């Protein structure tokens, strides 16, 4: 079963967005390679701001030290979070849009452990573990905005 306990002494150190550029431009968008302790969602937001992305879709895989997933409770109108440690990010997919002038990252993912047990859900936080995490970002021409749907209090992508 996936580890839900802290296993490293360096866990109290803050995760970080990379001080150096960890991506290259491609014909369709960007290829990003993140390294140990990088904040995946923060790095994607930083890319969106730096490169002035209108919107984008992305897929990724790699190794994570910490993955926090949330399952949205429509009664409480909030995510129920669960954190897992030291796992393979078997798959991640998501979108980059804008909300209140800032990048809004929406991602879902699946992580697995050495016994191939897997869990997944809405990504609330991802910290890269030992090794790397690779993300292919496909840029879109149209700027997309995310807004809170008042009925369910959840962020919804507008077209």
Model segments located where?
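N-terminal intrinsically disordered, cationic/polar leader segments
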Residues: 2-105, 110-159
